[in-house]
C-alpha cells in the first residue's frame, strides 16, 4: 500500500533547506510520496519564470501574486512574503528524484485561491474571498488555465502525479466564518450549480492526464451526498479522503466513492498534524494506531490505494519567520511513526 506525506507549504513558506530535510526524512522512512501544497488564501508560494496566463477571456499578469496572502481569523500567513522561484523548484524536484521520493505538487482550485483572487476580485464567487466563480465562463477558464500552466511545468520536470486540491469550495460564505457554518458545496448542491464543479473536476483530470500524470484531489465535492445526479466524474483521480463532513457539509462516504471506482487515499483528519493543531508533536502514538483501511466514521474500504498523513499550517506564524526549519525538524518523529505503521500493510 502506498504511503504519502502532505505538507501545507502554501500558508507557511518552507525554504529549500527545510524541504530537503523533510525529503531526507521521507527517504529514510521509505515513504513513497511527498505532496507539496503550494497555494492557499494565506500564501501563493511558487512563481514560474513566466507568470503571464492567457485564456479566451484575456491575458493575466500573475507576477504580483506570489508571497503572503491574507488572515482569516486565527489563520494567518507566516509573514515572510517569500515564495519559490522556478530555479528553487527545479532544485527541490531534482532532490526528491535523487532521494527516491516522488513529489506531488498541488495547485488548489476552485477553492483556497484567496491569495490569487486578491489581484483578480472580479473572478470571486459571490460572498467568497477564497473561491473562483466557476459559474462564470471567465472564472472557469481562469481556474483551468492556472492549472494547465503549472501542469505544463511539472510535467516537463518529470512529475508523475499532480493534485488540483478541490477541497472546501467557498467555505467562507457565511458571516460567521472562520467557523464553518455554511459551505459552498452544500449551497451549490441545492441550487443546481454543482454541475459546474463536475465540469471543472473532469476538465482538471483531463489536463493532468493529458500530460501523462496521475491526478489527485480531495474528495469534498465528489458525488456530494452520495448523489450522482449532476453527472459522471472521472475515476482516474485518486481521492484523498479526510472527513465525512458534518450537519451542514455532507460529503460522500468513503465506501460509496470506492464503489464508484475511485482509487482511495486515506487522508484521515484524526491523524492531522501541524501549526494550530494542539500538541501535534505528541501524535506519534495516535499515528501508530492508525489503520489505513478504516476511513472516517469507521467506514472500512477494501483495497485502498494508500494513506496520507497531512501537516497543515493553519497558524503559519507560530514558528516565526524561520522558513519552516523548526517544523521540518519536529515532524520527523511523527513521520517515522506513520512509516512504521504503513509497513504493516
Q: Where would I find each of the regions flagged by the language model?
A:
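Non-catalytic positions within long, well-ordered alpha-helices that form the structural scaffold/packing
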Residues: 27-28, 97, 155, 209
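Flexible, acidic glycine-rich loops studded with aromatic residues
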Residues: 215-220, 228-345
Amino acid at each position: 500500500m502506498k504511503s504519502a506525506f502532505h505538507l501545507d507549504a502554501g500558508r507557511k513558506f518552507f525554504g529549500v533547506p527545510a524541504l530537503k530535510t523533510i525529503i531526507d526524512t521521507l527517504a529514510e522512512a521509505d515513504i513513497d510520496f511527498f505532496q507539496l501544497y503550494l497555494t492557499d488564501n494565506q500564501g501563493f508560494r511558487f512563481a514560474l519564470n513566466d507568470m503571464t496566463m492567457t485564456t479566451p477571456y484575456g491575458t493575466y499578469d500573475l507576477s504580483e501574486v506570489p508571497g503572503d496572502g491574507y488572515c482569516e481569523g486565527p489563520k494567518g500567513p507566516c509573514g515572510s512574503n517569500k515564495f519559490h522561484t522556478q530555479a528553487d523548484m527545479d532544485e527541490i524536484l531534482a532532490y526528491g528524484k535523487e532521494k527516491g521520493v516522488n513529489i506531488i505538487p498541488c495547485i488548489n482550485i476552485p477553492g483556497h485561491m484567496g491569495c490569487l483572487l486578491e489581484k483578480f476580485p472580479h473572478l470571486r464567487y459571490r460572498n467568497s474571498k477564497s473561491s473562483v466563480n466557476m459559474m462564470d465562463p471567465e472564472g472557469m477558464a481562469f481556474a483551468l488555465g492556472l492549472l494547465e500552466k503549472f501542469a505544463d511545468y511539472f510535467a516537463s520536470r518529470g512529475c508523475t502525479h499532480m493534485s488540483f486540491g478541490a477541497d472546501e469550495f467557498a467555505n467562507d460564505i457565511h458571516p460567521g466564518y472562520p467557523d464553518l457554518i455554511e459551505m459552498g458545496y452544500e449551497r451549490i448542491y441545492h441550487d443546481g450549480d454543482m454541475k459546474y464543479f463536475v465540469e471543472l473536476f473532469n476538465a482538471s483530470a483531463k489536463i493532468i492526464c493529458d500530460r501523462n500524470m496521475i491526478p489527485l484531489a480531495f474528495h469534498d465535492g465528489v458525488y456530494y451526498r452520495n448523489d450522482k445526479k449532476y453527472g459522471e466524474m472521472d475515476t482516474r483521480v485518486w481521492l484523498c479522503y479526510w472527513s465525512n463532513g458534518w450537519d451542514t457539509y455532507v460529503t460522500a462516504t468513503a465506501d460509496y466513492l470506492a464503489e464508484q471506482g475511485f482509487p482511495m487515499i486515506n487522508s484521515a483528519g484524526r491523524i492531522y498534524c501541524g501549526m494550530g493543531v494542539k500538541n501535534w508533536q505528541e501524535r506519534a502514538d495516535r499515528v501508530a494506531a492508525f489503520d489505513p483501511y478504516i476511513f472516517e466514521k469507521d467506514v472500512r474500504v477494501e483495497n485502498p490505494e494508500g494513506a496520507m498523513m497531512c501537516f497543515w499550517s493553519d497558524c503559519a506564524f507560530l514558528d516565526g519567520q524561520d522558513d519552516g526549519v523548526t517544523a521540518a525538524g519536529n515532524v520527523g518523529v511523527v513521520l517515522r511513526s506513520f512509516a512504521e505503521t504503513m509497513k504493516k500493510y
